[in-house]
Regions:
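Hydrophobic alpha-helical transmembrane segments
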Residues: 38-42, 59-75, 273-289, 344-351
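Extracytoplasmic
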Residues: 372, 384-539
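Periplasmic/ER-lumenal interhelical loops and adjacent helix-loop junctions
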Residues: 208-289, 465
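Membrane-interface junctions at the ends of membrane-embedded or membrane-associated helices
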Residues: 80-84, 127-149, 178-191, 290-298, ...
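Membrane-helix boundary/interfacial segments in multi-pass membrane proteins
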Residues: 102-113, 225-228, 257-274, 296-349, ...
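Membrane-interface coil-to-helix junctions
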Residues: 1-71, 99-115, 237, 244-265, ...
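Membrane-interface helix-loop-helix junctions at transmembrane boundaries of multi-pass membrane enzymes
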Residues: 184-195, 262-270, 283-317, 367-368, ...
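Membrane-embedded helix bundles of polyisoprenyl
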Residues: 64-82, 87-181, 197, 201-207, ...
Length: 539
């Protein structure tokens, strides 16, 4: 629901950090939520779709669907940059773009589904590992075009993934810097990774600067974002077993998946860490590459990926480096299992490199006299790899519950008609009070259900949406605690036009009492939606 709210805001205003139609009688300021300022790339894409379509629902859906295309295209660019065959790059990028991680996160966690810049993070590491001209601090720094490209990458990375992806990128850049320093013994070489980290951090600070200024002017608000402590990093840490465990077994091994999920400890969102068939093969290959000679470009490149891979496992795993960081430094990042998408990409990239090398060997093999034999070998290689990729996509596809499309459509139309009727019955720009201001699901009312009024209206202002810990939240709690007769009198004095009730939030007896009291006080029957989920009492 929060995604479509952003889309709605983009159809009515420039950006999404304020909203004068929520939190009435106040204006909502979202500057307390740092995460709202740390996925600007996805919001920018949504803004484009919102401006073009003028429809929040369409803009939201197009934004979601575009993720898979953008992820595939960027991955293809990265693989072609390191000279991987075009069709190998295409197939491998398709596997990444349709990864179990992204499909599982879905639109509900779209800020994490938008992991299309992960390949750029890996490419930065490869450039620093292999090239001596990238981000080298010397007099020719601004003469090399590659540095501008690298800096642009850091800008994109910093504005994606609500702190997680920038943090993971900084980690692997530091791993690359240490590796480069250890291999060359030159501080200058290690500093190139540090420069990249500094630039990512610079752009992150730049993106959250409006929030920091707001906090300085209005005071900090610890209540807005709850982080209980370092122990949550254990709850949401990475489990190596789940890198190899699908979300579903397509009827083949569901029994074993269920046994693990029902009996193992700490099975949470980390179940989305599954690498897929191609990713698992690459992961195992990279583990072996830790111990191989590095006497060719391919082996050196695989060595780079293997170092990144094992380092990311150590960071993400339960009780690993991430837990130590949360305990000793900051617990604000808690779900280190989310590094699994980085692990998946380096694993897929490893397989792509090996297949690419196989193609090169076949083409350069002078022992094969017949050109037809080479062609047949290349065709067979392509077919086998293509089938592997298709099977990996199919096998990794999570069989999530199918939404009740007909019911959702019926409710959507009912909600839309109901809110339009409210808007037609009161003056433009009127304030509407939500009887139930609390956050979180209550009975059959889901979290964010109270956004329905805002989504389907054009000018009405709604009391829902207040930021915890701020004045509007205190006002809402104060009004919500009043006896119903005093509440009605006070709301009339404040200029509200009526009370909106989501009936799903109440037990039957409680709802009957509430609506009965309002009928008696206002001497008026309520408007009721066609699906009977909502009611409205006009003052």
């Amino acid at each position: 629901m929060g995604v479509i709210v952003n889309a709605k805001q983009f159809t009515e205003q420039f950006w999404n950090l304020t909203c004068d139609r929520l939190g009435a009688p106040y204006t909502i300021q979202y500057y307390d939520f740092t995460s709202s300022m740390m996925h600007n790339s996805g919001l920018f894409i949504m803004k484009i779709f919102a401006v073009i379509t003028k429809d929040a629902a369409v803009a939201m859906n197009l934004t979601y669907l575009s993720i898979f295309f953008i992820a595939g295209i960027i991955s293809y660019f990265v693989m072609r940059n390191i000279k991987i065959n075009c069709w190998v790059a295409s197939l491998s990028s398709a596997v990444f773009a349709l990864s179990p991680y992204m499909l599982f996160r879905n639109i509900g966690h779209i800020v994490l589904t938008e992991c299309y810049f992960v390949p750029l993070s890996i490419l930065l590491c490869i450039w620093i590992y292999e090239r001596d001209d990238v981000l080298t601090l010397d007099k020719d720094f601004f003469k090399r075009k590659i540095n501008y490209v690298a800096l642009f990458f850091t800008f994109l990375i910093a504005n994606n993934g609500i702190a997680y992806y920038p943090f993971f990128t900084c980690f692997i850049l530091m791993v690359t810097a240490v590796s480069k320093l250890a291999k060359t013994g030159k501080i200058k070489q290690g500093l190139r990774g540090v420069v990249a980290v500094i630039m990512v951090c610079f752009f992150v600070v730049l993106s959250i600067l409006p929030g920091k200024i707001y906090n300085i002017m209005n005071g900090s608000n610890a209540a807005a974002v709850d982080r209980s402590g370092f122990e949550q990093t254990e709850l949401y840490g990475l489990k190596i077993a789940q890198l190899f465990m699908p979300l579903n077994g397509h009827g083949w091994y569901d029994k074993y998946i269920d046994i693990y999920n029902e009996n193992a400890f700490l099975v949470t969102e980390n179940s989305s860490a599954y690498l897929g068939i191609l990713g698992m093969i690459g992961f195992i290959v990279l583990m072996f590459c830790l111990f191989t000679k590095r006497d060719s470009l391919l082996k050196k490149r695989l060595a780079c990926l293997s170092e990144l891979n094992i380092s990311m496992v150590l960071l993400g795993t339960i009780g690993g480096l991430g837990s130590m960081f949360a305990f000793f430094v900051s617990p604000m990042l808690r779900a280190y299992n989310r590094i699994s998408i980085f692990i998946e990409y380096v694993s897929i990239l490893a397989v792509a490199l090996l297949v690419n090398e196989l193609i090169r060997v076949i083409k350069d093999n002078k022992k094969v006299v017949s050109a037809w034999a080479k062609r047949i070998s290349l065709v067979l290689t392509g077919c086998i790899f293509g089938l592997m990729c298709l099977f990996s996509i199919w096998e990794g596809y999570p069989q999530l519950a199918t939404p009740a499309y007909d019911t959702n459509k019926m409710n959507y139309i009912s909600d839309k008609n109901f809110v339009e009727n409210i808007e037609n019955s009161v003056e433009a720009g009127s304030m509407i009070y939500h009887e139930y201001p609390e956050y979180g699901p209550v009975n059959d009312m889901w979290d964010y259900h109270l956004y329905i009024g805002y989504l389907h209206s054009k000018t009405l202002k709604w009391s829902y949406g207040s930021i915890k810990g701020r004045d509007e939240d205190k006002w809402n709690k104060n009004v919500g605690s009043m006896p119903i007769d005093k509440m009605v009198s006070y709301l009339k004095e404040q200029g509200f036009a009526g009370i909106y009730i989501d009936r799903r939030a109440y037990e039957e007896e409680e709802l009957t009492t509430l609506e009965g009291s309002l009928k008696q006080i206002l001497n008026e029957e309520p408007m009721i939606s066609d699906n009977e989920n909502l009611s409205f009492f006009k003052f």
